[in-house]
C-alpha cells in the first residue's frame, strides 16, 4: 500500500508531462489522418513505441526519485542523505542543502532556548531557596507574637506563602525528578501527620479537624519527599475547599497493597470536571469566583505518581465532598519498574 501511495504521488507530479505527450500523439494522429501521404499505421507504430519507451522512462525515474523521498519520509537526517549520496539529482541536492541549513538553524535555536529555560529555572530555584530563609525567620518572629488572634492570622498567611514556595520548588524540580529520588520503607502514619502539621494553621482558621484511622505498622516503600508532596497537595485542596468540617484519613491493607484514603466534606468536583482535574492550570468550572486556585496541585500529583508507581483514584460529588485514594505498590513492583528503566 505504501508503494502504491508513492506511485500515485509520483504520477500526480508528472501529470502535465504525461498530458503533453498524449496531446502530441493526438496531434500526430490528426496530421496523419489529414495528410494522405503519411501512413496512419506508421504513426501508430511510432506512438506505441514512444508510449512504451516513456513508460519505461517513468518507471526508471520513479524508482530513482521516490527512493529519495522515502528516505525523507522515514525521517532520515539530512546529514545522512548528504554523506550517503542519496540525493541523485541537482534539485535533490539543493533540497538537502536547504533542509540541512534549516535543521541546523533550528537545532541551534532549540539549544539556545533550552539553555535559557535552564538558566531561568536555576535562577527561580535559587530565588525560592533564598527566600525560604527569611520566610523561616519570619515564622520564628510570628511565634513570639503575644496576641493569639493576630498570631493565628499571621501563621495562616505564613502557611500560604510557604506552601506556594514549596509548590514552585517542586515544579522546577519535576524535570530532574529521576535524579532526586530515594526509595525506602517509611511509616505512612508519620508522613501524613507531618503534612497535617504543615497545614494546621490554615485548618485551624477554617475550623477543620482531622479524623485519623491508621494501623501503626503500615509502612510504604516510596520516596519520602515526593510522597509527602503528593499528600500535601491533596490535603491542601481538602482544606482549601472545606469549611467547618472534618477531613477523614484512613489507611488499610488491601490485598498486597497499602491504601491511603483522604476524604473531605467540602465543595466537591462536578462530574464534567473530573476528566480534567490533572490538567495544568485547570480550576473548577462550578466555582469560577475562586481566585486562590492555581490548578497546579493535582498536576504535580499526576506527574509524580507515575515515578512512584502510586495509583491515584479520585471520586467526588458536587457539594458533598471528595475522596482521594493512594494505592501504594509493594517493594517488588518498584524494583521491577526501576530495573526496566536501567
UniProtKB/Swiss-Prot annotation:
Location in or out of the cell: Cell membrane
Residue ranges occupied by any Histidine kinase domain in the UniProt entry: 126-332
Post-translational modification (record): Autophosphorylated.
Reactions mediated catalytically: ATP + protein L-histidine = ADP + protein N-phospho-L-histidine
Assigned EC number: 2.7.13.3
Listed InterPro entries: 2-comp_sensor_kinase (IPR050351), HATPase_C_sf (IPR036890), His_kinase_dom (IPR005467), HisK_dim/P_sf (IPR036097), Sig_transdc_His_kin-like_C (IPR004358)
A Pfam cross-reference name: HATPase_c
Coiled-coil parts of chain: none
Membrane topology, from the record: Multi-pass membrane protein
Assigned keywords, A-Z: Antibiotic resistance, ATP-binding, Cell membrane, Kinase, Membrane, Nucleotide-binding, Phosphoprotein, Transferase, Transmembrane, Transmembrane helix, Two-component regulatory system, Virulence
Main location: membrane
Molecular functions per Gene Ontology: ATP binding; phosphoprotein phosphatase activity; phosphorelay sensor kinase activity
Location of Phosphohistidine modifications: 129
Job description of the protein: Member of the two-component regulatory system GraR/GraS involved in resistance against cationic antimicrobial peptides (CAMPs). GraS probably functions as a sensor protein kinase which is autophosphorylated at a histidine residue and transfers its phosphate group to GraR.
PANTHER family with a match to the protein in the record: HISTIDINE KINASE, PHOSPHATE REGULON SENSOR PROTEIN PHOR
Protein name according to UniProt: Sensor histidine kinase GraS
Organism, as annotated: Staphylococcus saprophyticus subsp. saprophyticus (strain ATCC 15305 / DSM 20229 / NCIMB 8711 / NCTC 7292 / S-41)
Source species taxonomy: Bacteria, Bacillati, Bacillota, Bacilli, Bacillales
